[in-house]
Curated annotation (Swiss-Prot):
Residues 103-120, 181-234, 295-415 are cytoplasmic. One of its GO terms (cellular component) is Golgi membrane. Residues 1-49, 365-415 are annotated as: Disordered. The gene is tvp38. GO terms for biological process: mitotic spindle elongation; vesicle-mediated transport. Residues 1-81, 142-157, 256-273 are lumenal. Residues 149-258 are annotated as: VTT domain. It comes from Aspergillus niger (strain ATCC MYA-4892 / CBS 513.88 / FGSC A1513). Golgi membrane protein involved in vesicular trafficking and spindle migration. This is Golgi apparatus membrane protein tvp38.
Amino acid sequence: MPADYSSTARALSVSTSSPEPLSPSEDEAYPPWSRRAPGRRNSASISGGRSATLRDQIIDRATKTYHQILESWRKMNFWQRVGAVAAFLLANLLGIGFLVFTGKVFIWLQPVAAQWEHSPLAYGVLWLCVFFVSFPPLVGWSTFGTMAGYIFGIWKGWLLYASATVLGSTCSFIVSRTILSKFVHRLMERDKRFAALSLTLKYDGLKLLCMIRLCPLPYSVCNGAVSTFPTVQPLMYGLATALISPKLLVPAFIGNRLRVLSENNEEMSAGSKAVNICSIIVSICIGIFTGLYIYRRTLARAKELEAKEREDIRRSLQADHAAHRPHDAFSEDPEVNSAAALLARDEEERIGFGDLDDDHVDLAIDDESGSETSPHRTQASPYRDEFTDNDSDVFKDGDGTHEEMYTLHTHVRRP
């Protein structure tokens, strides 16, 4: 019998689970570029270079995007998939058509540019065009900037472009905030990321706004998107746009070089043409890489400020919880307080304050209607022995008649 018991125990102690993964086709859920060869699994840890880290970030981002697109595609029905493909093709056709149209515009401008250069009417019309494309969802802002440099030269074109951009973006900000006010409130109540980003702008709001304006984002859409942040004021947004106005010299310079190439094409030497073409390419590359660099810095700064804001809220919650006192308002501004309250609820769930601690016993006093009082309400209105004019002293009134009753409902609530 002991031998049978020992053999049975040894048999039960042997693991019957296979060390291999249950699903041999697990890698099929990942796109081809995210799969690594067996010999390269530890290549990132061996190299440890910055290029490996950047490569991993690009692969992870591409993988997440691939999964999101694939998940959205699987949720669509037949007609939704047809509409998505049609919208994708239409967007590509519009983009190609816009590029072709832009080229035709500069060909058409070549014979009239010299006449319009000293025309106040042409100056005013182009200024209004730049102003109105500031409102979403209009496009053509960069094209109008290049046209300004093409017709009026670098400095005069930049002055037109910058002044119309500053005033147009400010007016677009005000109009978008007025129209999108209800959308802002709904977004503040539901989206924690939106609330966190709006709170980060209260620290170095002007600096972050300038970085956002330098990012390669759609101009008119950016005006409408930033207007939804309640912590950003119109004057601050206009000031940030004015501070980054030297960036607008790039399209004006490109337009001026295009005119020089078109007018003096036959007279210019090969070296002069190469210099002008290279200056255009270098200007475009500087604008693209500067925008991408600032975009990454903006995201990093926003994450840093969000972490700081969450840390401050977490300390406040822990201090209030330890002192058994209700949470005060985070800010006098109702919009800022609403965003902070949303983050506070998220932090309470992370910390675990949503669940009551077993070591504490709270005394909850129900009202006459028998409704339960939440722990937050109990802390806000603690039990008191004093009587006010509206309360009755049961010891002073005596027993009273047989029909009169005084009841005190107390419950010791253990979470």
